[in-house]
Amino acid sequence: MKVTFEQLKAAFNRVLISRGVDSETADACAEMFARTTESGVYSHGVNRFPRFIQQLENGDIIPDAQPKRITSLGAIEQWDAQRSIGNLTAKKMMDRAIELAADHGIGLVALRNANHWMRGGSYGWQAAEKGYIGICWTNSIAVMPPWGAKECRIGTNPLIVAIPSTPITMVDMSMSMFSYGMLEVNRLAGRQLPVDGGFDDEGNLTKEPGVIEKNRRILPMGYWKGSGMSLVLDMIATLLSDGASVAEVTEDNSDEYGISQIFIAIEVDKLIDGPTRDAKLQRIMDYVTSAERADENQAIRLPGHEFTTLLAENRRNGITVDDSVWAKIQAL
């Protein structure tokens, strides 16, 4: 089905206010959920909203909490999210990293005791729109087996890198082949995954999203490489924030909350002039996209460039929402 941005935001706002969230916070949170969905990231927008409300009702998310600065070391700051609303706090932390970068050339904010930030790419994009390189990542509850194991002991720990090119170039990737959100999107659409995304119950690689969602044997990105990246991203976030690791979140908490996150902004213009920056970035993009195609009907894509098109299409034609997901939200 199709809905407008206004309908989507109003639905989110209604549910948030009905759960006791104050009107200003509810409006800002609903806006971010709706913007994420409008951008085409359904898995971490509208599809994720019922799960967000469940955690709000369970007390994992404290809606009136505000992040608190703990330590300041020039370009590096350490903050405590105090289990505040994840997407609103993440936006504030990237804003703070940008402020630090404006003063020092680079800014790093390490955040502990945080909640799920929903679409991580929003915060990289936020920096790139202002001309900064944006880098951020988060740890999570253990939802992926390390390479060679059956049990979930590492997080998908998504990493975002956004570059202020025209259009913005951005990688937004979990350390698994697919996020659990994308498994859900494909399952709801009745699609197999385009490549193997995990193991079935017999230990064979599979493209069936529903099987992987159920048994939790999701495949690390690049096999052992994604497994290793997940581990070191967790270690860095834990140390810099003095926060909880994947092991602590999984073993000590009843659900995924109290996680650790990193936000980095780099002011490119302190290192290179604007015209030179733009020319260098354009040459890189042209060089890549001019390569001979393996399939003449399939263009060579650059990461993040599709979001401008998706946003325009959704504004023109309405936002696609799965019927079952919309029914869940209406019932909240």
Curated annotation (Swiss-Prot):
Q: Which reaction does it catalyse?
A: 3-dehydro-L-gulonate + NAD(+) = 2,3-dioxo-L-gulonate + NADH + H(+); 3-dehydro-L-gulonate + NADP(+) = 2,3-dioxo-L-gulonate + NADPH + H(+)
* Xref: Gene3D superfamilies: 1.10.1530.10, Hypothetical oxidoreductase yiak, domain 2 (3.30.1370.60), Hypothetical oxidoreductase yiak, domain 3 (3.30.60.50)
Q: What are the protein's UniProt keywords?
A: Cytoplasm, NAD, Oxidoreductase
Q: What class of enzyme is it?
A: oxidoreductase
What is a GO molecular function of this protein?
Answer: 3-dehydro-L-gulonate 2-dehydrogenase activity
What residue intervals traverse the membrane?
none
Residues reported to bind NAD(+): I168, T169, M170, V171, D172, M173, S174, W224, K225, G304, H305, E306
Q: What is its EC number?
A: 1.1.1.130
Q: Look up the signal peptide feature and give its range.
A: none
Keyword Cytoplasm (UniProt): yes
Q: Which residues form the active site?
A: H44 (proton donor)
Question: What GO cellular component entries does it have?
Answer: cytoplasm
- Record-linked InterPro entries: Diketo_gul_Rdtase (IPR023689), Mal/L-sulf/L-lact_DH-like_ah (IPR043144), Mal/L-sulf/L-lact_DH-like_NADP (IPR043143), Mal/L-sulfo/L-lacto_DH-like_sf (IPR036111), Malate/L-lactate_DH-like (IPR003767)
Keyword Oxidoreductase attributed: yes
Q: Where in the cell is it found?
A: Cytoplasm
Task: Note the PANTHER family from the entry.
Answer: 2,3-DIKETO-L-GULONATE REDUCTASE, OXIDOREDUCTASE-RELATED
The UniProt subunit note reads as follows: Homodimer.
Q: Which family does it belong to?
A: Belongs to the LDH2/MDH2 oxidoreductase family. DlgD subfamily.
Stored HAMAP family: Diketo_gul_reduc (MF_00820)
**Name under which the protein is recorded:** 2,3-diketo-L-gulonate reductase
Q: Name the source organism.
A: Escherichia coli O6:K15:H31 (strain 536 / UPEC)
Q: Which gene encodes it?
A: dlgD
